[in-house]
Structure formats: structure tokens, C-alpha cells
Amino acid sequence: MKILVIHTAFIGDIVLSTPLIQRLKDMYPESEIDYLTLPTNKSVISNNPNLNEIILYDKKGQDKGIKGFLRVLKILKQKKYDYAVIPHRFIKSILLAKLAKIPNIVGFDVATGSFLLNKKVHYDMKKHEVERLLDLVEYKGEKIPIRIYPAKENFTKINKILEHHGYFGNEGQKLILVAPGSQRAEKMWPIEKYREIIERLKKNKNYFIGITGSKAEKKLSLNFPNDKNVIDFRGEINLVEFGALISKANIVVGNDSSPIHIASGFEKPFVIGIFGPGKRDLGFFPYTEKSNVIEDNEFYENNIVKIP
């Protein structure tokens, strides 16, 4: 069987779909599973052993408009898929599968263009997003964890950076990651609050604080050039390397964005999600019991997260 997953949303959404990928492979172990997504999302699923191929649809770049749509459609037609699973809730994704003549297409009832689906699944707002995605394949079993798969070279690079700053994972040393950015500015906790957290933590020389994010997030004013135990990873590592970094962390603090979802896929860190407009009730909180969510706007203004 040839299966296609279509999901062209944000990075965090792709991370949350990794349990769905695992479940599809468990259900159809001999199948070939391809994943269609944006180029910016590729690295977070690039080493996933359950995927056969990642197909890129640069809908905001070179594939923008009808010409790009037709280019991707041609690829899908040639693949002759048997089954399409579409977490993305927009008609363009459903149209790609329909026009590619995939005989079995499943997606959510709230999707625009859901009338084109062979099977519509209820999008249950009471559930976590991971569980909603697993509803697409009618899974009701034990929890399937989020997973990304850093390679050996990713760990080597991260270890080299950490050791350069004096972090060796020795007893007493703590690695705390702070992810202050988001692709949506309205989800970001005030940067001065993150600065205050870092200022407090860096006083303990056994605490190593890693500031993470994209190259664009370097503009956020969190610079500590004279503090060796504050390490700025922004723009220096990709998402899979970020996974390798997270696997070593004791604590991850971040906004309602992809870092807290990636962190949920690793056993070691305790995850603190700081939520503003994206409320926990929407189902996008950290998918791990080792977590805490702060989502009261008034609380933001009067408190600093306390980290032991």
C-alpha cells in the first residue's frame, strides 16, 4: 500500500503528527508512507524511519500559485497512492489528493472542502491535537509519543558546543533551554520576562542556559556575551540538532510554539509552556506528563516562572 500524509502547516503541527506516522506504520507495516509538507518543515521529519519520501510543496515560495500547485499535483499523480490522510484543514490539501485520484481520502469534518473527502472524522476540540490526529485512523490505544530522530552527527555537534562552554553533564550541572520566539508574535511572552529568568539563573554557575530559536530571532534582545554559561544557539542549529540538544536538557521553557512540542518527545526534560492567546483548551499543550502550562495573562505580568 502507498500512503500519503498531507500537512503543510507550521513546524509544531508537523511535530505533533509524528504519532500519526508511527500508527500508520504499525497498521500497515509493509506500506510506503510519503509526507507532503513545506520546505521549512523538512528537517524535523527528515530522519523518521517510518517515512519513505518527503515531498516538498513550497506554496509560499517557488510553488506559489496555480503553476506550483500543478507541479506538485503531477508528482502525486505519478505516485499512484492508495490512501491519503490529511491533517491539514484547508481545501487546497484536499484538492491535491482528490485531483491526484487517490481512491481513499480521510480528513476532518471542519476542513474547508471536507465534502470532497471519502471519510470525514470529527475534530474533537476536547482532545489534545495528537489525539485528534490519531482519530483519523481510529486509534484508541495507549499513548504514542511524539518522536523526532537526531542522527549521530547531530549529537556530536551539540556536544562540541556544550563542552566548549563547560557543560559536560556532570553531577550538579543543569542544562536549561529558553525558547523565547514564535512564528506568531502574539504568542510570545514579553522578552524582558525571559531576560529576567536568565538573569536569575545565570548567577548559579552550575546552570547552563541555552537560548534557542531561528536566525531571525536573534533580533530578540537576549544577549549575554560575557556569561560563558549562557549559550546562544539561535540560528546556529537546525531542528534535528535542536532535538539532540533537547535530549540533554533538564528543563525547557517556551511559548506556545514548536520547541515545547519537540521537547515533549524526549524523556529527560521538564517542559514549561507559557501560553497567551493560544489557550490550553485548544489542545496544543505539551504532550507529556512532565510539564506545566502557564496561561493566565494577569499571571504573566506579576510573576516569574520559578525553576529550582
Regions found by a protein language model. Name each.
Residues 1-308:
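Catalytic machinery of carbohydrate-active enzymes
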